[in-house]
Amino acid sequence: MSAFQTEITPTLLNLFETLFSVQLTDETNRIRDVLSQLDAQLFRSYTKPHATKIHTTIESGIFSPTWAPAPTAAQKSVADRDPSPYVFTVLLDLVIVHTESSTTSAPLTPRILRSLFESTTTSLIQTFQSNILSTVSLPQLMQATLDVEFMAQTLASYTTDAASQVQTDIYQVLDQKTDNAARVRLQEELGNLRTVLKRLREGTKVQFACFRRVKRTGTGQMPGPGGEEERGRR
């Protein structure tokens, strides 16, 4: 549909105008509008089932009683933890989408992944806003920050302004549901959290290599001391 809209149809219209010495301005605009609507419908028909699946995965993961375990005696800090299982489920689902799209219509892959990344961030903030999660404890705050940040850094090549803004809003939602002691501890643990994220990026760079083909800098904004924030360090 994309090729038909951007290449085939304009060529046919130009050829018709040339052969018959007529201008089809109004007709061309109507055709473009119809093709744009068809393209959007086809695109949604493909991405919506994936977005719905991602939303269900995120909700079940975050609402699970085992989502954010308290640190054990063997852990060096409360930030010393792994991303939740739902994070890897979502990312592996997107690997499959990437593979399907790349093998059938490679030019559409970035558009599809950007759309699904936006859907992912939307599902995250909706889940964190839920009354089911009325308050956020320190382990939950650390787990949420790690989960969001790891997904954002892994999918940094497909970030958008909208997704980046939602990521920032997620941290505000979490901040509103936690207490001051947890906020202070989060700031103290940011160095450890960055170390964990670096280890995770190195450990999964082969597993999620398909997402790193397009290099872009800057995704979201992980909360930092004095309002300073950063995301997407590689």
Regions found by a protein language model. Name each.
Residues 1-234:
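Extended alpha-helical "rod" scaffolds
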